[in-house]
Amino acid sequence: MGRLSRGRAAVALVLPATVTALALASCGDDDSDETTTSASQAADLTAVKDYLTGHTADLIDHVAVLRDNGEQYYELAESVNFDYARLMQEHGDQVERLLADSKEAYVRANPAYEEMEGIVAGVPRLSQYDVDIDAGSDASDPENAVSFSLELPNGVTLKQPGNLFFVTETALYGTNPDFLAKGTEQDVDGDGREEFGEGIPDANIYVAAVREFDQQAQSLDADAQEFEPTPSDAFTALTIMTPTMSEYFEAWKNSRFIAGEDASELGFVASSRLSDIADILEGLVFTYDEIEPLVAEESAQQAEQTRKQLTGLLAYVEDLRDQESSGHEYTAEQADTLGAEAQRRAEAIAGQVTQAAERLGIELQEA
């Protein structure tokens, strides 16, 4: 299913031996084996917190639009006793406007989250938000499922439906029949044709989802305001979230951007997964920039090399994204090859960050 479990729990801090060897080999000629505890304690990561809270505030704003529109949509459906054919006949223009506005809000909410995902998903004490908002599966995959169930206004409980971006996107864009209205064609613009990207959501499910989304966004923001990032948090986020390229590229390969009508991913339809990957890496580059002086305390050469490789990985993905947005079509085979290259680079970077943390005496947290 689209936008469901990414298997991040399986991304261990124990990296392949070849990666560790690479990290050891690239540490430069620094003869000191002493840790720089004082440097790590003195690190000021206020900028990381500001980056996080700026993005949580943006997410709140965009999700508030989704919720407000969802409430209006629910009221319209309720006014016709959830007769969706009648809803479109009597209120079609309003529905079309609300859903179009909601899609715009969704497209803005997505990067607001993805750019901070490296921190949210990479810091264990924040990572449950990533499961519920962006990465968790539905009840069919209990190990990776979201923690919440949706209590619908009609009294029905929708047990662990999948993460909130997944539910919202697939309802708005009509790719998951489970979340769509019954008894009417999925023809939002009233032109007599059901076209890709048109979805008339089940109002009970949709309003429950955007209410939960609003609550989760508010809660994440509250915890972000209390969050005081440490070097351990930053190093951990980089080691957990950088070597996840292969699973992201797999989702891209299975999405409509490559597979077309044969896509097995229900999500990733509003924008390409490549855009998400670039956004995630952008946040990781920002995070590394804030700890690079610590790495340089032990080895300026290593600090520079890691920065170059991480920014190079971002540039690599941005180039793929830009080519795709300009009309270039990739094949599934190319996606596999490109993903393998991205993963190779990412594992090397994570190995270097792991080695730097060890030399600095900075603890890496368990995912």
State what each model feature region is:
Residues P16-T20:
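Classical Sec-dependent N-terminal signal peptides that target proteins to the secretory pathway
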Residues G28-D31:
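Bacterial signal peptide processing site
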Residues D33-T35:
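Extracytoplasmic/periplasmic copper-protein system
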Residues T37-A367:
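Mature extracytoplasmic or organellar-lumen-exposed domains after removal of signal/transit peptides
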